[in-house]
Amino acid sequence: MLEAISSTAISAGQAASRATETQAIAPAAPTAIQSGGDVGFDSVMKQVTTDAIGTLKAGEAASISAMQGKESTRRVVEALMSAEQALQTAVAVRDKVVQAYQEVVRMSI
């Protein structure tokens, strides 16, 4: 005989599935910069770069999992949108750094 499927059993199954998905392809969480010391621009930029690379790798891993049929479309879209946002931020920072460098070069001594 078939057992009656309750909404509680379905919810528990969905929660377990989501937990597994989250653990499998979770983007790298931003790590806190250690306080108490002298925090320089270089250490902040290094941390931001590391976080962006982790996000891009998570998006790539989600795409590969989707091609293998292991990942839902919704999760892949979320990971890729997060990766796209990280890439756009990196490009914007690069553009600002180049612009600042060009301004310094143009300064008269």
UniProtKB/Swiss-Prot annotation:
Protein name in the entry: Flagellar hook-basal body complex protein FliE 2
A Pfam family of this chain: FliE
GO biological process: bacterial-type flagellum assembly; bacterial-type flagellum-dependent cell motility
Lineage: superkingdom: Bacteria
Organism of provenance: Bradyrhizobium diazoefficiens (strain JCM 10833 / BCRC 13528 / IAM 13628 / NBRC 14792 / USDA 110)
Membership in a protein family: Belongs to the FliE family.
Keywords: Bacterial flagellum
CC annotations in GO: bacterial-type flagellum basal body
HAMAP family referenced in this protein's UniProt entry, alphabetically: FliE
The keyword Cytoplasm appears for this protein: no
Statement: the UniProt record of this protein carries the keyword Transmembrane helix: no
MF annotations from Gene Ontology: cytoskeletal motor activity; structural molecule activity
Primary localisation category: other
Localization terms from the record: Bacterial flagellum basal body
